[in-house]
């Protein structure tokens, strides 16, 4: 079973507690308003990251992550949207 860590609306704020909170997760899913490329990079360096952009996200994040992210994991259809 895949363990998922879910968050959104970080608005460019990094908190080292994310690492502790998500340490037992296999993937992190971010539902938009990441807020800075640094936050996205740090999350992706820690665990595989699936994300979408939100209304505050700039061009760098919008070019990397879609508005909608739909995929199947372990037979379950998932849609992430901000």
Predicted regions and their residues:
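N-terminal active-site segment of His-dependent metallophosphoesterases
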Residues: 1-49, 57-70, 75, 80
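Short beta-strand/loop motif that positions the catalytic acidic residue
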Residues: 52
């Amino acid at each position: 079973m895949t363990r998922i860590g879910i968050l959104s609306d970080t608005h460019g704020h990094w908190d080292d507690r994310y690492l502790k909170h998500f340490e037992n997760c296999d993937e992190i899913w971010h539902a938009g308003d990441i807020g800075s490329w640094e936050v996205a990079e740090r999350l992706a360096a820690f665990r595989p990251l699936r994300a979408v952009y939100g209304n505050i996200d700039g061009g760098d994040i919008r070019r990397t992550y879609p508005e909608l992210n739909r995929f199947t994991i372990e037979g379950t259809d998932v849609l992430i949207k901000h």
